[in-house]
């Protein structure tokens, strides 16, 4: 990456007249001059398109306790992690048997 650029990985909020925006990734640019402009006179103002969906609604807060903590006997199902290994082994065995026959 160029030495003039630094990436900010921490999400943050920007409060604007239109609402609050969550910035997931930002790029900091160094050694770039700032052009002052007034929104009523200039065309260099950031354009923000209004969302077509209804305004954001606050969701109720999540429950304070995890469901797993309430029922310790209930086991969490795990996905088979050896699935790819078994697929490759079966493919290898099929190819080997074809070559030997």
Curated annotation (Swiss-Prot):
The modification Phosphoserine is found at residues 53, 62. It is found in: Virion. Keywords: DNA-binding, Host-virus interaction, Inhibition of host innate immune response by virus, Late protein, Phosphoprotein, Viral immunoevasion, Virion. Induction: Expressed in the late phase of the viral replicative cycle. It comes from the Viruses. This is Phosphoprotein OPG062. It comes from Vaccinia virus (strain Western Reserve) (VACV). GO terms for molecular function: DNA binding; molecular sequestering activity.
């Amino acid at each position: 990456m160029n030495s003039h650029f630094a990436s900010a990985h921490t999400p943050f909020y920007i409060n604007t007249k239109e609402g609050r925006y969550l910035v997931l990734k930002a790029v900091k640019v160094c050694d770039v001059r700032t052009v002052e402009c007034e929104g009523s006179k200039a065309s260099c103002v950031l354009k923000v398109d209004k969302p077509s969906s209804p305004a954001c609604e606050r969701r109720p807060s999540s429950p304070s306790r995890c469901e797993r903590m309430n029922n310790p006997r209930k086991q969490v199902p795990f996905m088979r992690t050896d699935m790819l290994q078994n697929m490759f082994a079966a493919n290898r065995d099929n190819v080997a048997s074809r070559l030997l026959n």
